Design a protein with these regions (language model features):
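Short, structured coil segments at secondary-structure junctions
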Residues: 61, 133-134, 200, 220, ...
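C-terminal helix-to-coil terminal segments
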Residues: 297-326
């Protein structure tokens, strides 16, 4: 595996889930794969779970790890072509990327959407330059439009809490619900969550106010429901997440906050109409905006198991990439 951005990059999700369970049972089983190999983690944006879980995964596999915070101690990097670099950016990605490739065997990149130019963001300009110019396998630690390590961890978590699914049992009903936020956030997490849930063939419903339609590339055949309470009826899993306007129906609104309706905050009344549903969120979460304290602290909250599974999803991905080197 030379790149990891989308569910299809893993191939069979059933096999990937089995591999995840194998690794969870013995996290150091494949430590030999990373001997004398180096992972470079490049951060253009902040991180807690991604930084810790990915570094731990690489260490589980016996790798050395270099962490580069682009905005803390490194030269400011220019990402656009054809510009006259007479501002505060001293180095271009086109030189920086192959230099990074000289010092490592794998590269993980975290670079959020700017939310000002939809075409630029959805072209995945930054991470695709790493893929093209680094000469190394590259995986997304959240890019402009996707967060596959999170979505894979979410899928692992859901599969662990639906033991009959896949063995002739009922498909779980999973609801991806928009929730309010004080800042404009990218669509990477909901995009990937919808994509991976479709690939796993769950009964997926996406609910949000009008104007927040996600890109059809990720939503696929999932049902879109603008009535949140109706969408939540009988849900086995409720995945809450804010996202800014994706600009699908009105490109001029891309990246904007169109709604601050607090009735979309997930509370006990929302969870009461579910099928004893489990609450999920990628974290970090704004309590009182996305979800109420009683819901996130309830026994049905899976936010910590999700976070723990980030180590497992990253280990599977890095293992696959190390195997591709041999």
């Amino acid at each position: 595996m030379k790149t990891f951005q989308y569910a299809k990059d893993l191939g069979s999700l059933k096999q990937a889930l089995a591999e995840a369970q194998e690794i969870k049972n013995d996290r150091f089983k494949y430590q030999h794969l990373g001997k004398n190999k180096t992972l470079m983690m490049v951060f253009f944006n902040n991180s807690l779970r991604t930084r810790l879980s990915t570094q731990k995964a690489a260490m589980n596999l016996g790798m050395n790890v270099i962490v580069l915070d682009v905005n803390a101690g490194a030269w400011k990097l220019e990402t656009e072509r054809g510009v006259i670099m007479d501002g505060d950016k001293s180095e271009h990605l086109l030189e920086a990327i192959p230099v990074m490739g000289c010092y490592c065997d794998l590269i993980g990149v975290r670079s959020f959407a700017g939310l000002s130019d939809r075409d630029y963001d959805y072209a995945e300009t930054v991470i695709n330059q790493f893929v093209k110019y680094s000469g190394r396998p590259v995986f997304a630690m959240e890019s402009a439009t996707v967060h596959p390590l999170q979505a894979f961890a979410d899928l692992i978590t859901i599969s662990e809490h639906t033991p009959d699914w896949g063995n002739g049992g009922r498909r779980p009903k999973v609801v991806l619900s928009w929730a309010p936020h004080c800042r404009a956030l990218p669509q990477a997490v909901p995009n990937s969550f919808a994509e991976w849930m479709n690939a796993a063939d769950v009964d997926l419903v996406v609910t949000h106010p009008e104007g927040y339609e996600l890109d059809p590339l990720f939503v696929g055949n999932a049902r879109v429901e603008y009535d949140q309470m109706k969408a939540l009826e009988g849900a086995d899993f409720v995945y809450a997440k804010n996202w800014s306007c994706p600009g699908v129906t009105r490109p001029e609104d891309y990246g904007k906050i169109l709604c601050k309706d607090m009735s979309w905050t997930i509370d006990a009344a929302h969870m009461a109409v579910t099928n004893n549903g489990k609450f999920m969120h990628c974290l970090p979460v704004r309590r009182g905006l996305i979800v109420t304290d009683d819901v996130i602290e309830s026994p049905n909250s899976l936010v910590i198991p999700e976070a723990a599974n980030r180590e497992i999803s990253a280990t599977v991905v890095i293992k696959r990439m190390l195997e591709s080197l041999s």
